[in-house]
Each structure stands twice: as C-alpha cells, then as structure tokens.
Amino acid sequence: MKRPPLSLKRRNPPLRKRRAEAEKNAVPETLGTFRLQPGEALAELVRALYGSGSALELVLGKNPGYRNDIGAGPQDLTLPAVLYAPPPSMTKGVLLSLGAFGTLEEAYTAWRGYGKRSPSVALTPIWRPGEGLSFHILAPRGFASERAAWSWLSRFSPPAEASVRLLSPFDGACLVFHKFTVK
C-alpha cells in the first residue's frame, strides 16, 4: 500500500484532533452527565445549574429512570442544555469569573463550597465557539468596568482557592444555560 505524501499528512490533522475541534464548535445538546449521590437533592442541583427550578420537568424528562428515593444509590443523570437569554447588564462591560471548570461535577462541588453564600454567585454553563462548553462560577451580574468588578470582589471575598479572572461579556455567539434574575 502506498503511503500519502508527507505534505498531505501535515495538512490533515489526526482524526482525534479534528474530533476535538468539532466538539468545541458543536452546540451541545446536553450539559453532560452528573452523578447524584444519595442524600443530594435533584431540585437543589437544578436551581443551582439553571438558575431556576423551572427546568426540573425537562431534567426529569431526560431521565425517566430517576428515583426520588433517599435509599437509592448514586444515579447518573443526563442534564439537558436549556438555553436562556442573558440579561442586558451581562452583554456589555465585563463579567467576573470566580472559577472555570471542565465538568459540572467539579463546578458544582466548588459552588457548594460557598455554603450559605452560594446564592450570591451563579453556577453558569457557557458555550463559546472554539472554546466549547465550560462551567463558571460568576458574580451574579455584569460590571460596567474592570474597576467595578474588582470592587465587588473585594467586598465579597471569595475562598482562597478561587481562580478569579475577568471575562468578556455575553455576545451573540455565546450561549448561556443559566437564567439570571438581574436586569
């Protein structure tokens, strides 16, 4: 069998690399799977992830085998990608991320680490073309300037392990899977 010329090999990246690029550019149908442990409440996860309990019926529809039973063992749940329009205040200025995670389980664990302050931050799945799906813990609103974002942060004082950075605002190419209650 004749091998393709070396120049062709360089122009055509390996299949696994092309698949990874395609995944980053493909709009997700789900936010992935999540292993709900015994004693964890599905309603709490849904409120944290989607910003509202209204997505609970959609989650249950994707998981017909879900058992709302305290004695049930761990349950793997498929979480649908429910698209929400970002509030106008988060489409300009800057956003403040207190951590970015590759999986929902990592992000949910970090969000729960905020304890009683967890409602003060938003566990937000975000998809951007070329970057794919990621999970951020965001300040619950956008900021007009970097200075305003840093000022909010100094009053909030996140945990020491928080990986704080500024993000560009949500734009037309960005998909947001969290319902914010700010204007």
Which residues fall in each region the model found?
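Primarily a LysM-type cell-wall glycan-binding module
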Residues: 21-50, 90-97, 101, 125-133
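Residue-level detector of conserved, well-ordered beta-strand and adjacent loop positions
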Residues: 37, 60, 99, 140, ...
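Non-catalytic surface loops within mature trypsin-like serine protease
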Residues: 81-83, 100-103, 144, 168
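Short, well-ordered beta-strand segments in beta-rich or mixed alpha/beta enzyme
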Residues: 135-144
